[in-house]
Every structure is written in structure tokens, then in C-alpha cells.
């Protein structure tokens, strides 16, 4: 080995050691200035001999070139989410379900951790070297963020120690400490940059930078909490044991991990963490509770999207008091007019809240709310701000009543409130710019026509400039016309045109959902498409015929019938088809020719399945001639009840409908 190679090896080993002491052990031995000096020395030597630079060198955390787009990484082991509980009663019920499933009266040993409010990531090590990293994504596929994760100093590029598996995928949370968050926003305000609403958004935005050099400047950190792939090695047989092993290999683990030997001990841990929450220095939104024994975890297994052996115990939504300065009225896709309270800005659960929905006139009346009132604001689920109540004892002398508009605030059309409905609606239809915008945004959304790259701001400009009036107009757009929009260059414009062309090939169900018929969500659209098969059959269906579709009652049937009875709607559909929107011809299943116990039956799935996903079960049932519905009614022939089946099972029993379990379903599917 050359002297310079020896020097490089020693420097890298020294720097990794001090990174471990700083980020994992929280016990630095040297000042930052000395660390910086060692890093500079390493950089200078590598500059002399670039052929000796290794991928796991501490200098390689910031060297990747900017990405043009994120590639996708498929998770070999799905990244499942956790079920939630929100109060002690729900947790105790969860504890009992676990004990019942284990057929044990002895207390379970629980491993309790903090529920970090950051971004879940998967990091793959091969022979101890970091080779890839990905976001959770949809649980099956995530975004490749390897270059950015390599810039996070808390994450070792190379594990140290003995008995490291050949392939080890660790999972954890990337997050931003509050001090770092405040510094980022302080710098942004000074330079006119983006100010983030909360540390989680800042962490997500930092991790998804196309230029890793920007990520490297953000003080992100990481805690490890689990494992995915494990090949060519072994891990301890308890969750806590695994976390301690990860820490020994150089991976950071929270110091607030605790074993609890009873439900009461778990509740004590929860209360202590909630009390300490303001002083932790980073955001959490609850605690995570896991069965410590891996053998018991395997015995308990999984439901469709979550393990049975773990749960997230969320903290209550945080509340603050503030004043209502005004109330404005927004118009939605279906003409619904929603009152929105404009508030004196206030921090609630780490977010600056300045608006809150008031839902409708009935809610305003229920609250007894007036403009100028002092109110209690809650972020329900830590996401959607809402007004909880009015502080009547502190009502100011000068308050004003909230007057609901008699005409649309956008287009001036009359408003109406149908008897029996809480919602007031604009009658303007597509002549209303607000409805047009929201309808088009729905039309191009991912679960509808899925037009990649056509965001809300583009739709807003297209409507405001009178370029687009109906969904069909979207497919007539040219790159030249789009290039005239704000922040839209020729390449971006052509990408949108290409995406529109690609979106023309869709499915009947997606097309129906995209049309935005009132009360027709994805499931109902799929049911209508499966039942009628063709657009022609659906357009000519009567209200009685529509009600034969599972889950379609008189209200939905009337909305669908009225939509297709409207000449302007039929005209838009004709234009869409003329522009080339199409979908595959229906596969007609003749139930008389299908030899299956499910043929011609209306079937409802309820509860959690353990042997296959709900979507797989629906697809297999439909292939055997079943009509899969979402709710139980007198038209239901069969209910398949998985774990934790609830009200649907009770209703089926009340109506005397045949009920089978998952095992029987699987037997019949193979019959």
C-alpha cells in the first residue's frame, strides 16, 4: 500500500469515528474546527489522487451532480404504514386484541419509541456499504433519493463492526431539528427564499431536492427504527435487540426507546413523552408501540397495510385561541359554497394557521360565530384547521354577523340550498370560473385522467385567460399556447402536451370519475363501469336501472341520470371522444357460463384480509362473475368477513345475509 493510501484510510477511519461519536453517541471528542480541519486534509489528498476516492469516503456526501428527475425504486419488502389509536381506551382495546390473538393472559412486552414527524426512508447496505435509499412512496415503490441521503452526516456511508449482513435494509425517519428549521427559515426570509410551514415540510423539501448539494446544506438528521431486507446474516430476536445492534454498527437510534411490561407502563411512557414533547428539540406526533418479541410478531402477522403487532398512539390535536378577522366564501367543483374563516395568524401544532374551514351555514349557526369573535382553533389530525368553539365569555363589543351570499361571489349567479342538504350551491355551472377551475383540476388529477405535469396553477391560468372552457378544450392545447403561460418554457409545454396525449388512453371507470358527477367517487364509477360496460348503455339507463348497481341508491342514481340528461354534458363527452379519448372494450362475463359459486352474486368485503390484498380479492371475485359492492343492503347476496369486521358484518347478520370468512372465500376461489 502506498503511503498516501495509508494516510487516506486513516483519515477516513478517524472521520467516521468522530461522525459516530457526534451523531450516534452524542458524545463528541473533538471541536467542530478540528473535524473541519481533518475533512479539509482528506479533500486535499483526494484531489491529488482522485483515482483513490472511494464511494464511502466522508467527502462523497455532497459530490453528486444535480438530478433531472427521481428514478423509482421498488421495495422488495413493502413499507407498510401503522394503524393509529388516539386515546387510552383504543390502546387498551388494541392490547386486548393482541393478547386474544396470542391466546395468552400474560402481559406482552412492548417496545415503545417516539413517532417522529419527518419522512420515512429505506436505506440499503450491501456488505456494509450504502448502495441505495428511497422514500416510502406508496409502500410498494418509492423515489430514489440515494444522492441526497448520502449528504446526511448522521447516516453512515459504511457500517462498522462485525457480523454485518450481506444485504441489510434499514428503515427510519429523516427529520429536521427545530433549531435547524428556524435557521433555514431565517435565512430564507433574509434572502427572499422559500419559507417552510413546519419542520416536516422542510425535511421533505430538503430530501427531494434535485441538487444534492442543496440537501447537504440542510441540517437533516436520522433515526433508525426497523428493518426490511435481511440476507446473508442474522439479527437479534427482539426489536430492542435489533435497534441496539444497529447502533453498534453506527446507525443512529433514538435514546427514548423503552421496554414496557404492562399496558399501564405503556400509558405512563406515553404521558411522559407528551409532557417532554416541547423540550425534545424536534417534532413528534405520538409514540409507536411494538411487540418486542420477533417470534410473537411473526405469530401475529399482518393485515392488508399494517402489522398486527404495532400501533401508533397519536397525541391529541393541539388547540390555540385566536380571532376571526373576516369570513370569505369559496366555490368548489360542484358549486358548493364553503365559508372560510380568515384568522389572526396563530401557531397550532407547529404550523402557522391563518384560515379555517367553517363547512356550511349550519356549522356557523351551531357555533354561534360572528366576525371579530375569539375562537378556539384545532388542527384535526394535525392537518386540517377547524374552529372548535367560540369563547363567548371574551366576545368583543364590536362583532358582526356572518351573512351568507345570495349570489355566487365569483360569477354572480343565484345560489340555492336544496331542502335536506346543508350545502349552499352556485347555480352557474361551467359559466362560473371557480367551478370551471375546480372541475378541470379534478379531471386531470392522478386518480382521474392522470395528466402528469398539469398542476393547479396551470389550470388557473388557462381558465383566467379563457383558453379552456371544458375538459375537451384541454386536448386542443398546443405547446405554443402553453408556452405563453407564466413559468412555462417550450420544453415544459411540450411535456404537458405529451402527457395530455398519453392520458387519452384511459379506462371507462377513470373517465366516469373524471367527469365529476355529483356523489360519484372512484368506487361508484368503477361499479357503474362494470355493470353497464359501455358509455351508451350508461347514458340511456333509467333511474330504476341505475339503482340495480351495487352501492347506488336513489340520490346517486338521480345525480347520474340528471348529468347524462343535460345536453351540454353529452356535448362535452362527444367532444372528448372526438379528441381521441378512449378505453378498452369491456370484457363481458356471462354469469350463466361461469362455473363459480360467486357468479351473479352481489358480494361485500369487510374487515382485514391476511392472505391477499382487498384489491386482489375484488379482482378475483369480479373475474368469477361477482358484483363487488361497498356497502351491505337487501340486494347483497354474500358478505366476506375478515379480521375486525365491524358495522357491515352486524348489518349482514341483522338482514340474514350469508356470511363467510376469508378461509372459506379462498377455498371457494379455488373451487
UniProtKB/Swiss-Prot annotation:
One of the protein's GO biological processes: DNA repair
InterPro entries xref list: BRCT_dom (IPR001357), BRCT_dom_sf (IPR036420), DisA/LigA_HHH (IPR041663), DNA_ligase (IPR001679), DNA_ligase_AS (IPR018239), DNA_ligase_CS (IPR033136), DNAligase_adenylation (IPR013839), DNAligase_N (IPR013840)
Record-annotated active site: 115
Presence of keyword Metal-binding: yes
Recorded GO CC terms: cytosol
Catalytic activity: NAD(+) + (deoxyribonucleotide)n-3'-hydroxyl + 5'-phospho-(deoxyribonucleotide)m = (deoxyribonucleotide)n+m + AMP + beta-nicotinamide D-nucleotide
Residues annotated for Zn(2+) binding in this entry: 408, 411, 426, 432
HAMAP family: DNA_ligase_A
Cofactor(s) in the UniProt record: Mg(2+); Mn(2+)
UniProt gene name: ligA
Keyword terms: DNA damage, DNA repair, DNA replication, Ligase, Magnesium, Manganese, Metal-binding, NAD, Zinc
Signal peptide (UniProt feature, chain positions): none
Official protein name in the record: DNA ligase
Sequence ranges assigned to domain BRCT in this UniProt record: 593-671
Family, similarity comment: Belongs to the NAD-dependent DNA ligase family. LigA subfamily.
Residues engaged in binding NAD(+): 32-36, 81-82, 113, 136, 173, 290, 314
Pfam families per the UniProt record, alphabetical: BRCT, DNA_ligase_aden, DNA_ligase_OB, DNA_ligase_ZBD, HHH_2, HHH_5, Nlig-Ia
